Amino acid sequence: MSALPAIPASLPRRHSNLGQKLGLWLLKLLGGWSIQGELPAHNKIVIAVAPHTSNQDFFVGIAAALALDLKIRFLGKHSIFVWPVKRLLLSLGGIPVDRSHPQGVVGQVVAEFEQSDSLLLGLSPEGSRKKVQQWRSGFWFIAKQAQVPICLVGLDYNRNQLVFGPCMDAGENFADDLQQMRAFFQQMTAKYPENA
């Protein structure tokens, strides 16, 4: 595995040498993944990770976050945050969300951004491992309403690389922004390309 990219001081850290070693070991175990690109220097970010076609994507993402010693959060249905896995999910960065909540998921996550000094939220724009006709727009609305950038991270199974790409502010039109995002993600090879 190549050297890790430089980590800007503004990014929230876990401060865990053991976690970093575990993350590096997991990246090697999962097929010798490397981390490429330049990490963004923002303390609040929506990280859009794609293409998402396999359960392994989650484990590569968690391993990379641990290896980089970054405190990256992710969303999970509130009903999975129960004993015996609740403590593990929370310690890995899970944020329980209730889809039936009057604020909706977007409102709950925007409130989380507003209450946090720093928050890196990683999620999949596809919203599913299956092939989808269109990406969900929730991540875009979260970034727009919370006034935080969207940073693109690609999973390239052809080269076993997790690639930090460009960051952008949510513009006036989701469809226009999506075109820009897809131009980056089309350079990546999914684990199951037929589902990308």
Label the predicted regions.
Residues 15-52:
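Helix-to-loop junction immediately C-terminal to a conserved catalytic motif
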Residues 23, 58-61, 106, 178:
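A general structural signal for well-ordered alpha-helical segments in protein cores
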Residues 32, 69-71, 91-93, 118, ...:
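A generic structural signal for alpha->beta connector loops
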Residues 18-20, 57, 81, 134-135:
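Residue-level preference for nonpolar/small residues embedded in alpha-helices
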Residues 38-100, 157:
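Catalytic core of membrane glycerolipid acyltransferases/transacylases, capturing the structured
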Residues 2-18, 29, 102-196:
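Non-catalytic C-terminal accessory region of glycerolipid acyltransferases
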Residues 12-24, 89-101:
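Acidic/glycine-enriched edge-of-secondary-structure segments
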